[in-house]
Amino acid sequence: MPCHGMMRGIVQPCPGPRGLAVMTFVSRSRRAVLGLAPAALLLAAMPSAQAADAADQTLLNATYDVGRELFSEINPLFVAKWQKEHGGQLKIDQSYGGTSRQAQDIIQGKKADTVTFNQVPDIEILVKRRLVAKDWASQFPNNSSPYYSTIAFMVRKGNPKNIRNWDDLARPDVKLVFPNPKTSGNARYSYLGAWNHAQEQFPNDEAAAKAFMGRFLGNVENFPTGGRGATVAFAQNGQGDVLLTFESEIKSILAGKEFKDQGFELVVPPVSVMAAFPVAIVDKVVDAKGTREVARAYLEFQYSKEIQQLLARHNLRVHDPEVVAATADQFAKVRLVDPATFPGGWEGIQKTHFASGGLLDQLLAAGRH
């Protein structure tokens, strides 16, 4: 590119395909070389130009829509570490967007070496297209999930609608904002959190569970394609009473300067879904580019204590025991339910809820009549 658990350095923004944001991370050493006079640069390059060219690598990581701040910190750290240990030049391009959309772009030819997604099904789509290995989940610890979060609620100052639990989200006086589950992993977890609540409230009454979901979805005021759009709709445009998103995202919003004067508040329901953030190597791409070693090291880096601590600072729940113990007071107590334990696992969830003509489509269609 020229512009380039619990229960059961420079950043250059570039236009990406289909509106996806792409960021480029370049090392300080590379900037230093670029600043050399042409003659000096030529003399320095002459003895080993072929070797230097062979060592230069570019990695493209495709990730979820609200991952900008996190990966803008992770990527320069990894670039510095890799170049110190291996030499040569490494550049990381970063693509952001709803992960379902990202997966489709990879299927259509986007050359992502790695994916750091926020839901398993979008990696499984790549497995079915033989872009990712079938055993991807066993290639890294914790089912290839370096960190996780949960779905929580962001409400307006003083919590005027007294939102406490999933039941409150189905009340007729409450309006919701969260992304479209067809395009966003974030939104699928929000939907599944509501579905889990309905199943626990009405364990033997499918009709009552569906009725609850109908009321819940009927309260959605805005269905953006990704998490960032949902945040803008709620926080900047004033839409809705409740924003459903990752706990980590809400905490980042509350700690940031952009919306601090609005006094938003975090509500963590007593029960919610565990939102794993799975990672994988896109085998077909790394084999073609010769980047498997650096791609694997990049994902392994996210399990290092340094990055586990960084993840916790970004309000993400992690697996490293020492970091977990040190940050225990940072996170609300919540019973987390893993969607993988739902009937049929993620494959069953996809077929039942999110496939064309599935329960989500049925409920949305019913709400329009």
Task: Give the positions of each predicted feature.
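N-terminal export leaders
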Residues: 30-34
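Bacterial N-terminal signal peptides
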Residues: 35-45
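N-terminal segment of the mature folded domain
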Residues: 53-183, 328, 335, 361-368
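Short beta-strand->loop
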Residues: 62-64, 155-156, 175-202, 216-223, ...
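A bilobed periplasmic-binding-protein/Venus flytrap-type ligand-binding module shared by bacterial periplasmic
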Residues: 150-159, 276-293, 310-314
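Short helix-loop capping/hinge motifs at secondary-structure junctions, enriched
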Residues: 158-164, 183, 196-204, 285-293
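Ligand-binding pocket segment of bilobal, Venus flytrap-like solute-binding proteins
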Residues: 201-269
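Extracellular/periplasmic juxtamembrane helices and adjacent flexible linkers that interface
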Residues: 286-369
